[in-house]
Swiss-Prot record:
The chain crosses the membrane at residues 18-38, 43-63, 71-91, 99-119, 146-166, 227-247, 256-276, 288-308. NCBIfam families: cytochr_II_ccsB. GO terms for molecular function: heme binding. Required during biogenesis of c-type cytochromes (cytochrome c6 and cytochrome f) at the step of heme attachment. This is Cytochrome c biogenesis protein CcsA. GO terms for biological process: cytochrome complex assembly. It is a multi-pass membrane protein. Belongs to the CcmF/CycK/Ccl1/NrfE/CcsA family. Keywords: Chloroplast, Cytochrome c-type biogenesis, Membrane, Plastid, Thylakoid, Transmembrane, Transmembrane helix. InterPro entries: Cyt_c_assembly, Cyt_c_biogenesis_CcsA, Cyt_c_biogenesis_CcsA/CcmC. It comes from Spinacia oleracea. Its main location: plastid. It is found in: Plastid, Chloroplast thylakoid membrane. It holds the Pfam family Cytochrom_C_asm.
Amino acid sequence: MIFSTLEHILTHISFSTVSVVITLHLITLLVNEIVGLYNSLEKGMLVTFFCITGLLVTRWVYWKHFPLSDLYESLIFLSWSFYLIHMIPSFLKKEKNSLNVITAPSAIFTQGFATSGLLTEMHQSGILVPALQSQWLMMHVSMMVLGYAALLGGSLLSVTLLIIIFQKDLIQVFDKRKHLLNESFFFGEIQYINEKSNIVQNASPSYVRNYYRSQLIEQLDHWSYRVISLGFIFLTIGILSGAVWANEAWGSYWNWDPKETWAFITWTIFAIYLHIRTNKNLRGANSAIVAFIGFLIIWICYFGVNLLGIGLHSYGSFTLTLN
């Protein structure tokens, strides 16, 4: 009872904190910046991160297994991964970056879906099925979910890049507010180039727009590549550890189970992305399109088996019931 109450409290504190932070930052889009709110997002994200961490630890202690046994727990861990990826660059460089624009809302929406009424039946865990009672559970599933989080974040940066490339007029909308975007822009704030050389200052408005646009595209492409590379490493480790676990549990390293097949397709798509990035002539829009395809494939891989409830990886499947 105590653990259940603590989990309930941590869930609501984390979601309420982030909701307040979002509201405050939305207000700053309509009025001038309010003193004291400049770093409110990072502080709110930090509080939420520790609450989600406490929630996972609580379930781990209470149910006596690593909290990655069903869709609800994996979504909470995915949300935790987004929070982690969000904060690491800020702690390392102490500056804003375009990654924050993606990771913050991703974490919030993932957590919101996990705590919604759709997965209520999964909030109460239970005894693991024999196949999941292995030390490989933590290694395999955590690496896969961390990989999904990084790949999704990097892919969304690529989607943003595509929007900017194919809709040039979009930049003009943001030009009304401190050269393209105010630094307090939604969720973590894209940091546009601070250098203001005399050439740029004396240039025509169209030249300035093109300059900032090219710098933004370069920054998005840079962060997308770094985050996807990290996610690809996690995904590779997850697939390899899963193969070893499958051999122990089912007597075969690879069974072409639906989850395994889609995981392999996901790995192949992002391997193609990384290969394209080695060619300078194909960077930008070409690699971003591949990343966008990978983004769609990840959701098929992550939710597909759970929704269909088929295959050897259908332990955490769920069905939607209508009242």
